[in-house]
Every structure is written in C-alpha cells, then in structure tokens.
Amino acid sequence: MGNDFVVPREEDPRREAVESRGYTVVGESWGARLELANAPDLSIFRGTLSRVEHAGIKIFELPVTASSDLYELERANTADFPFTPATSHDLLDAEATRDLWNKGFRVSGTRDGELLVGATVIARREKHAETEFTSVLASQRSSGIGTAVKAASIIACANDGARVFGTGGAAANEARLGVNRALGYNITERWYSYKAPLA
C-alpha cells in the first residue's frame, strides 16, 4: 500500500490528524463476528436453508473435483467485488483455487443444472471459522443463495466445533453486509481508507 494510503480504524485518534493533512476517504470496510453458544442453536441457519430448498434450491458441500467450477464462478464475478485499499478480492488461478481444499477450506455451493451459481469458502481453526469469500452469479442474486450458502457453511463448521465466526468486506457491498446481518453477525470494527493528497 506504500505511503499513498493509510487505513485507520474508525475509533483511531489519528484520523483527525490524517484529515488535517489533506488525506481524503476513498473507501470504507468492516469486520463482523458471529458468536454461538457452547450448545449452539442452529435453527436460524437451518431455517434459511429450508426456505431456499422450498424454492427448489439445494445447497451442498462441494468436493475438490468442483474446483474448476468454483474458478469459473469467481472469474465471472471478479469485476463485481468492490475494491478498497483495505479490502480487495484477488482472482485465484485454477491451481490456487484447487489448493483451497488442500489447505482445509470448506466450500458450500449450489448449482443451476450443471452450472455452479453460488458458493462460499470458509476455513476453521479449532473454535474459530473465517469466511474467505462468498460468490453468487449476477443472474442469481437476490434469490437468497448468498445467505443460504453461508448458512450452510456455518452449520458445517459449528458441527465440527467452531463457535466464533468472522467475516468482512467493503462498505460499498451492501448486499454482503445484509447477508451477514441476517445471519446474526455484528459489526465489530470499521476502517477508513485515506488517500494522500497530490504533491
């Protein structure tokens, strides 16, 4: 990022000094957490899955043999991910996409026929799970798929012992923020990306 940008948290007292030097906000981003009880109530997530299943949408865990489909989904969507200096989404190549499974990530998704139209990628480390990304084909958005694949990933990781879930994104991606709030995530931190004034 160099010296062209600074990315303080919302409560950082340095923001006032940065603004006084002529830096301007060029992006906002957020982090959110979901905390489950030791004996978690997963009914909200199961209810989310039930609603889309009634609409004919089936969510399932994807095996590594679906890596090329995930790569094609990401390639179709890469231009739609908002960019900020603090929040970027880089398109993985086909080999790196396949390697997600080798690194222990789990992928929940759904298909329209043979076409993968939505997926979320999550990693669990003991009791903590972090969403890497969620991707839904443009033609399938506003159908509940994004919420459903994320709900499925939460159930899978919770059943394996995860109790704290993390995620984040750019403030410009209101749909992603809405998905996470619907599933019970709470915003825990915000960052502002400031760009230095022209010399």
Give, region by region, the residue ranges found by the protein language model.
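A conserved beta-strand-loop-helix scaffold within acyl/acetyltransferase catalytic domains
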Residues: 78-138
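Conserved GNAT acetyl-CoA-binding A-motif
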Residues: 1-8, 157-169
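Short amphipathic alpha-helix that is part of the acyltransferase structural core
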Residues: 46-89
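Conserved active-site alpha-helix within GNAT-family acetyltransferase domains
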Residues: 9-28, 147, 171-189
